[in-house]
Regions:
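Bacterial N-terminal signal peptides
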Residues: 10-19
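Domain-level marker for long, solvent-exposed, non-transmembrane regions
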Residues: 22-161
Length: 161
């Protein structure tokens, strides 16, 4: 091979490497993290690991609590380990989200009654993780949900028997 051919091969390889490295960089990826039961207590409360998003950390924490209670009522929650039983939804009615939408809107309103049935499980500094993006904050934490209290409320409201 001549010197001219070697230069052409090196130039072609350099252009190929540069072209391959000029891909679109993904800045944010969507992850669908499902809530999971971390532990259960004898008083009917469940510690649930969940995610919430908001404009600031306080709003994200409130959304995290709403999400945990919502999942318990309407969707059920999977267990994080094999020695804890998964939790079925409290409302087993078909189309429960649509049927009880008015009740749910009042219950989950800002400052709503849902706050009486959940609390931050671990109050130590650093127990919740916050991830900041350009426009929002995403929070991951563990929330204690009073499932026994929620069942009693739903029975009292006539939603479940």
């Amino acid at each position: 091979m001549t010197m001219k051919t070697n230069v052409k091969v090196l130039l072609f390889a350099a252009i190929l490497i540069i072209a391959a490295s000029c891909g679109v960089k993904v800045s944010q990826t969507y992850y669908d993290q499902k809530p999971q039961i971390v532990s259960t207590e004898l008083d009917g409360t469940y510690a649930i690991s969940c995610w919430g998003t908001g404009r600031n950390s306080d709003e994200a924490m409130k959304e995290l609590q709403k999400q945990a209670v919502y999942e318990v009522i309407f969707n059920g929650v999977a267990s994080a380990s094999s020695n804890i039983q998964s939790l079925k939804p409290l409302i087993l009615t078909v189309n429960a989200k649509d049927k009880y939408a008015e009740w749910a809107n009042r219950f989950f309103a800002d400052g709503g009654e849902y706050q009486n049935y959940c609390s931050k499980h671990d109050r130590r500094t650093g127990s919740s993780k916050f991830y900041k993006t350009a426009n929002q904050v995403k929070c991951q934490g563990v929330v204690s949900v009073d499932v026994a209290g929620l069942k009693a409320l739903l029975k009292e409201s006539g939603i479940i028997k």
